[in-house]
Structure formats: structure tokens, C-alpha cells
């Protein structure tokens, strides 16, 4: 998608424990990267799949499919290590991180959208219920990154669970996620006085709160009070994004699964595109094939653009008829176990490229191959983008689309026919870690897209008539490694012969 430039041992009720941290149990608890072994998942349904209720999805010790309690604890540990570096020179200052979940959003009265968790919150704990708060607190007398992780979650409520389904509650939250402590959401207010203290640095994204109501009820008064303190509230999102930028082996495995199943969905959608065909049918076919193979949802509204509509980069109406002889550009991806894919392919719906279509398609395919070869440590998306524009400029000259263009104007001319970047970071979000600049040197573990395109509107009088109305983009998902790049979407055909064979395959 183009991107514009154990039965848990709970702490006693807060009413009996001033400030959440003064009880005997808290002082005796061991805080470490290892989950407490005696915490058993409650033998009931929680607010999300668990190894007890969904053994076909999660192994024991996993919080979300493929990701263990230890992995989530390590993420929190790494975040507190970054905060330790940021807070150097602030000896005697407590550090507290606050991350809010998403709320439930509604399309109309009493009709909710499917809930999707805030990805920064999800990245740090794996908890998938709305109206929750994650707190990471430094420990008195211990240096960072030592800390304790606390979840504040919705209270068990039989009347609401009758309508909305089960909630994890404090016992389920602590056992499933492996955090150190869990309380009901209402008990968060008892933590606020400590955070308001002069000796406490709070890390919280008050400029872009993910949950407006929780921000208004709890965090806005805190940020206003801290504005008068020497230790003001500092944003934490960029630190989390720095961690999310480099994927672990477990994350890459999740993304490989998403890439493979999306590739298979593309193959089946290509096969189903017999001309004439409605864009809406291909949309439905693609979504069905993703979901049938285990995807949770689509990663974004797909672009299913036939003919000249492929020149609208984020065309998502998907309601027109694609005629015999036209190509379709399908930009689609899925979300599987919290990680997404993002793939684009362009093909003729009748199964045969015309000569002009083949010329333009082969030009983009060559450019994409050259850009993929640049996906190695030390280069950057900006470097690859510059190379893409150079290559596009040369191809536009070769095809006779750009004439009499001086070398110093080639970039500008190339941007006319490819107004988007070469790619973006990919992970839990499609346009992942948006605060991270594309000038960063690539490192092993980064996942990016490479998606050159050429778009020639049907009213472009400068281009040869045979190319007018054609738009081609080819997009793959790439893991940067120490060696050659790992293409997560390698199973998705893009050679012209392969595409034509699939489209002409017998039913």
C-alpha cells in the first residue's frame, strides 16, 4: 500500500493497600523476565483466546499465537532500558510508563466495529481487551531496567458479559500475560498521586492519546499537574517504535505466515478474474481466501482498481466493472496473529497481457528486481527511493513516455508518473512505525515493502496513446537480513508467464 510522502496470587484490594505497592506480597514478589510458573490460566473463557480455550491457536505460555510471555516481558525490559538511557542524569527519579488501550468504537447506536487493539499497548503486553491501562514502574532501590508491570483491566461483570462476551478479569489478565500485578480499571486512580510527585517522571503520549475517555478521566489531570513540575510528562511512542522497528525471529515467523496465506489468496483471486468481472467480486474473493486460510481480518481496505482507476493510488470504492482487455491492480493484505502483509499485483483479467501492457509491466518488474537487490544492511529506504526514481526515469525514456527531458529534470518527471515512495516499514501496522524516518540505515530484522509503480492517466496527452489509462504497481514484503533479503511474499506470482498460466488454469 503506497505511503504518501496457576491460580494467580493477586495483590489484595487497593482499598486495603495504599498506593498499590505497600503490601507485603508486593515487597516479596520477584520481578524478572521469567513468568511465574504457578500462574495457571483460568479454566474458563477469557476476553481473548488462551492456551486453555484455543489450544489449536496457542501453545502453553503464549499470550498471542507464536509469542510467549517471555517475549512480551523482554519487550518491556528493552523499553525500560531505553528509558534508562533517556533518563541519565536524573538520579533519585522514579520512572513510570503509562500506555492506554483502544476503546470500543461504534458505527451506530449499540453497533460496535470489530475491536482492534492499540498496537503499542498490544506490543508490550498482548492484552486484547478495550478500556485497559498498562503501567511499567521502576522499583525503589533498584536500577532500571528493573521494573514491575501492572495491568488495569475491566472488572468482571455478568450483565455486560451476557451481551459482549467474557472478560479476562484480573486473574485472567495476570495469568495470561505474565505481568506482575493486575487490578480493575477503577483502581488506577489510586496510582495517580504517586505519579504527580516531583520525584516521578511519567512517560505517556498525551499529545495523541489512544483512548479519549481514559485520557480525560485520568491522564489529562495528571499531565496538567505535571506541567507545573520540573519532571514533565514525556512521550513514549517513539521509544516503542524504535523497538517495533526490529523484528524478533518469532515476529518474522508470524509475518511469513501472513505473507504465505496472502500469496495464496492472490493466486486464487487471479484464477477467479474471468473477464468481464466486477471489482467487488474480486474484493470478496480475496477476503474470503485470506480468511479461509486463517487470517483474522484484512489489514486495510484493499485497492481493487480496474483499467484507468489503477491511477488512483488509494482507490477503494471497488464498485466498477472491469472489462475484457483491461488490467486490475489489487493492493491487499491481511492481519494474522497481530502482524500484517501488504502485497500488490497487476494482471489482465482476461489472462493475456496486450503488447503495451506487457511493455509497461516488464519495465516495472525490472525496476522492482533492482530495488529488491538493494535491500541490505546500511542502505535506507530513501537511498532505494532515489534509485527507483532514476530507474523509472530511464524506463520512461525507453518507452517513449518522457521525451526531451534533461537529466536534472528526470527526478521531477519520474515523480509525475510515480508520486509515491518506494516503500515503508511493515509490522503490526501496514504503515508501521510512522515516526521512524525512512533515512535510517536498514538493519537485519527490519521489514519493509518495495513497491515501484508507473501510472499513466487516460487523459495524459504527453504519453503515447497505447499506454494511456494503464497503471502498474508490483509490491513485495521484505525482511532485511545479514545476507540476501528474505521475500515474505515470494509465493505470490509476478512473472508474466506465471500470471498468464494461473489466469488460464482450468476450473
Swiss-Prot record:
Query: Single Gene Ontology BP term?
Result: proteolysis
Q: What is its EC number?
A: 3.4.11.9
* Residues the entry annotates as binding Mn(2+) 2: 331, 342, 475
Keyword Protease attached: yes
For the protein in the UniProt heading, the enzyme class is hydrolase
Q: Where do the record's region annotations for Interaction with TNFRSF1B lie?
A: 54-79
User: Per the entry, which co-factors are needed?
Assistant: Mn(2+)
Positions binding substrate in this chain are: 300, 331, 342, 424, 431, 451, 475
Quick one: where is this thing mainly located? mitochondrion
Q: Which reactions fall under this protein's catalytic activity?
A: Release of any N-terminal amino acid, including proline, that is linked to proline, even from a dipeptide or tripeptide
The answer to whether keyword Mitochondrion applies is yes
GO molecular function per UniProt: manganese ion binding; metalloaminopeptidase activity
Q: Which PANTHER family match?
A: XAA-PRO AMINOPEPTIDASE 3
Q: Which family does it belong to?
A: Belongs to the peptidase M24B family.
User: What is the protein named?
Assistant: Xaa-Pro aminopeptidase 3
Which lineage is the organism of this entry classified under, starting from the top rank? Answer: Eukaryota, Metazoa, Chordata, Craniata, Vertebrata
